[in-house]
From Swiss-Prot:
Coiled coil found in the keyword field: no
Keyword Transcription regulation on entry: yes
Protein's UniProt name: Transcription termination/antitermination protein NusG
A Pfam short name: KOW
Record gene name: nusG
PROSITE patterns assigned to the protein according to its UniProt record, in alphabetical order: NUSG (PS01014)
Organism taxonomic ancestry: Bacteria, Pseudomonadati, Pseudomonadota, Gammaproteobacteria, Pasteurellales
Highest taxon in the source lineage: Bacteria
HAMAP family the record matches: NusG
Length: 183
């Protein structure tokens, strides 16, 4: 670890699962404490906002899309390496060797950052349905009927389900909260 890179690159840290937020906060505090802000950029726990329907009410929550990992933008040198490794609950860097971690590619970093941006603009639904999937209607006039998903509209949180009524397939529009997956 004798090379000094002058450009900040993105590295992935493995943290104890469930402690990603605490690791990110502690790392930011260590960076300030050791006055190394010029050698570090962002410290991120990649999360996305998801919307779920609970008892007919829409509720937003955050979900980590890389559980157990923290992204760090930094210049890699002996001091920054030791600072990161000294943070409690950090198991190490992902990629490269223990002494010389490898950064993720700029393309990978851009993909993750774009996903973070999209999530903040438009929350995803926790329930994900696919056309052709079998569901059971749980509420409304078609309760206890089984059907096949034909269309999914995540913007409105609605599905078009083909329900068999008296032997005929009938398309029915339902909200995500009115159905559950059968398998």
């Amino acid at each position: 670890m004798t090379e000094t890179t002058t450009k900040k690159r993105w590295y992935v840290l493995q943290a104890f699962s469930g402690f990603e937020g605490r690791v990110a906060t502690t790392l930011r505090e260590y960076i300030k404490l050791h006055q190394m802000e010029d050698q570090f950029g962002e410290v991120l726990v990649p999360t996305e906002e998801v919307v779920e329907n609970v008892a007919g009410k829409r509720r937003k929550s955050e979900r980590k899309f890389f559980p157990g990992y923290v992204l760090v933008q930094m210049e890699m040198n002996d001091e920054t390496w030791h600072l990161v490794r000294s943070v409690p609950r950090v198991m190490g860097f992902i990629g490269g060797t223990a002494d010389k971690p490898a950064p993720i590619s700029q393309r990978e970093a851009d993909r993750i950052l774009n996903r973070l941006q999209e999530s903040s603009e438009k929350p995803r639904h926790r329930k994900e349905f696919q056309p052709g999937e079998e569901v059971r209607v749980t509420e409304g006039p078609f309760a206890d009927f089984n059907g096949t998903v034909e269309e999914v509209d995540y913007e409105k949180g609605r599905l078009k389900v083909s329900v068999s009524i008296f032997g005929r397939a009938t398309p029915v529009e339902l909200e995500f909260s009115q159905v559950e997956k059968t398998n």
